[in-house]
């Protein structure tokens, strides 16, 4: 079996760890893994390549997504774009797809699944707005970062005897 992995949309902390975990699970089952570079945009450009275990080793500590991310209006708005994406994945030998991303990314994965390509969605968004999930990848880090920044601003506000307003998202 050969699966492809794609990261798309806005990035969230932990996306690379999710990518590595998906690939490691596939390898443990004896499957091959393909990486789709630059999200749905890269998928429609045919940017699909094999991944080996050694490549994944350093991914966990890196921010962002090592595969890149990109949106595609052709994919989002046209049925032909989705059909072309499936054709490219199948030409590369992929029998399934793992999509790591937020709501729009997972909607794209659902569309591919409905067109016959088995697809798994991994929710990764700091917005934590994916229906049916309690926490998505990235939200804990985002909230802890906000709390840390607010603690620092509080010290500054106290020193200047001022109130501060912090807007998040």
Positions of the model-derived regions?
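Polyanion-binding loop/helix "lid" in catalytic or ligand-binding cores
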Residues: 147-169
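Solvent-exposed alpha-helices and their adjacent loops that cap or buttress functional pockets
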Residues: 4, 26, 57-61, 88-92, ...
């Amino acid at each position: 079996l050969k699966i492809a992995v794609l990261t798309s949309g806005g990035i969230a902390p932990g996306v690379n760890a999710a990518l590595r975990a998906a690939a490691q699970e596939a390898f443990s089952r004896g499957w091959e893994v393909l990486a789709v570079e630059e999200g749905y945009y890269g998928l429609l450009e045919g940017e699909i390549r094999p991944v080996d275990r050694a490549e994944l080793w350093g991914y966990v500590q890196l921010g962002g997504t090592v595969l890149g991310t990109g949106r595609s209006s052709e994919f989002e708005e046209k049925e032909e774009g989705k059909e072309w994406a499936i054709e490219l994945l199948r030409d590369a030998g992929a029998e399934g797809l793992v999509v790591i991303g937020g709501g729009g990314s997972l909607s794209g994965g659902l569309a591919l699944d409905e067109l016959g390509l088995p697809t798994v969605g991994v929710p990764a968004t700091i917005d934590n707005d994916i229906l049916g999930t309690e926490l998505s990848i990235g939200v804990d880090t985002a909230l802890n970062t906000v709390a840390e920044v607010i603690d620092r601003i509080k010290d500054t506000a106290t020193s200047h005897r001022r109130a501060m307003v912090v807007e998040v998202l």
